């Protein structure tokens, strides 16, 4: 089963919220968020690859990921985890970074509307033995255009995740 709800913008800053159901156990979907082999297969929009997914999946840990564009440009992000409840919830802050994990303001590279710290909350819900649902929420955007760009990329990523876990 594949259900995707539309993203929405709310409040003084804007957020992206995406809910998706999977024909897979919640533990398998949760694993896809922290297993480096899985993350390399789904954490990129169409046409991109993820050559680096150095996962340090623990509260206080920081993962380093790299998306490579079709023309070979590398874009690094870190995920710094503040809360992990197995099979229930992951909270992290995404930062754009250099290849060494040093964060920078996305506006410095022409990405106005993306905050330096993009808070992510992923909730997981079991819908039965082989069915689950996640909701991904990204917080802090200041531009409706960036919300739409992030939503489009997130939908592509989560569709790739579905192909892996189902």
Where are these regions (language model features)?
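Hydrophobic ligand-binding cavity/cleft-lining segments
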Residues: 1-50
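Intrinsic-disorder/low-complexity, polar/charged segments enriched in Ser/Thr/Lys/Arg/Asp/Glu/Gln
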Residues: 13-21, 26, 62, 76, ...
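Short beta-edge strand/loop motif at the mouth of beta-sheet-based domains
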Residues: 17, 37-80
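Hydrophobic/aromatic beta-strand elements that line small-molecule binding cavities or substrate pockets
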Residues: 20, 52-53, 77-83, 117-126
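A short, structured loop/turn motif at beta-sheet edges
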Residues: 26-28, 56-58, 82-90, 123-133, ...
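Hydrophobic pocket/interface hotspot
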Residues: 29-32, 39, 63, 81, ...
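Short Pro/Gly-enriched beta-strand edge/turn motifs at strand-loop
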Residues: 35-36, 60-64, 102-109
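Beta-strand/loop substructures that line and gate deep hydrophobic ligand-binding cavities in soluble
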Residues: 91-94, 101-155
């Amino acid at each position: 089963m594949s259900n995707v709800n539309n993203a929405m913008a709310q409040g003084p800053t804007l957020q992206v919220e995406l809910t998706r159901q999977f024909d897979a156990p919640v533990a398998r979907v949760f694993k896809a968020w922290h297993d480096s082999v899985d993350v390399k297969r789904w954490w990129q929009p169409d046409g991109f690859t993820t050559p680096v997914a150095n996962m340090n999946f623990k509260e206080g840990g920081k993962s380093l990921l790299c998306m490579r564009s079709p023309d070979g440009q590398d874009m690094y992000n870190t995920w710094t985890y503040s809360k992990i409840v197995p099979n229930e919830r992951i909270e992290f802050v995404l930062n754009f970074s250099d290849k060494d994990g040093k964060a920078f303001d996305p506006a410095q590279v022409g990405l106005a509307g993306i905050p330096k710290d993009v808070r992510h909350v992923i909730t997981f819900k079991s819908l039965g033995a082989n069915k689950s649902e996640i909701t991904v929420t990204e917080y802090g955007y200041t531009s409706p255009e960036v919300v739409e760009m992030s939503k489009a990329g997130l939908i592509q990523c989560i569709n790739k995740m579905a192909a892996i876990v189902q």
